[in-house]
Amino acid sequence: KLLIQNKISLNTRIPAQEMINKHADLILSWQWENNLNYLYFDAAWMGAPVVHNANLCPDLGYYYEGFQMYEAADVVEEAIKSHPTDETYLERNREVIKRYTHHNKNLIKQYNELLENLVNNKFVEMNYNWQDNSVSPK
C-alpha cells in the first residue's frame, strides 16, 4: 500500500565495486556518528578518492574536519588535483583499513576480552587510540 501511494521507494543495492568503477570519480562522504562506514572503506580499499569527515580514521583517503563544508570543498579540490598522480594512495589506505580487520591482532585480543567480560557480566569501558592502535580501559 505504501509503495502504491508513493510514500516509500525501493531501490536496488548496487555493489560498491560496480558503483565506484562505473559511476564515480570521487566519493564525498559526510557522516555523523558513523565513523567506520564500510562504503568509504570499500572505496578507499579499491583506490577511489574518498573525501570524508570520519574522525576515527583521518588518515584514510582525504579528510576534512567535522562539518566544515568550505574545508571539505578545498579537500575535494586537493583530491581532484593530487589523486591521479598519488602512487602510494592505495597502499596507504589498505594499511589504514587493516587496523580494523583480522590483521590487527591487538584489536582481536581486545574484542575477545570484551566479549569474555560481557559473557561474565563484567563491564569495562575502553578507549581506542587510532594513532598507535592501542586499546585501554577508561
Where is each model-derived feature located?
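Nucleotide-activated donor-binding/catalytic signature segment of Leloir-type glycosyltransferases, i.e.
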Residues: 1-14, 18-19
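Repeat-unit-sized solenoid/scaffold elements
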Residues: 11-14, 57, 136-137
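Alpha-helix initiation/capping motif
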Residues: 15, 25, 53, 108-109
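Short amphipathic alpha-helical segments and helix-helix/interface helices
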Residues: 16-17, 40-41, 112
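Generic alpha-helical secondary structure signal
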Residues: 18, 70, 105-109
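Catalytic binding pocket for nucleotide-activated donors in carbohydrate/polymer assembly enzymes
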Residues: 22-102
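A charged, aromatic-enriched C-terminal amphipathic alpha-helix characteristic of glycosyltransferases
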Residues: 83-137
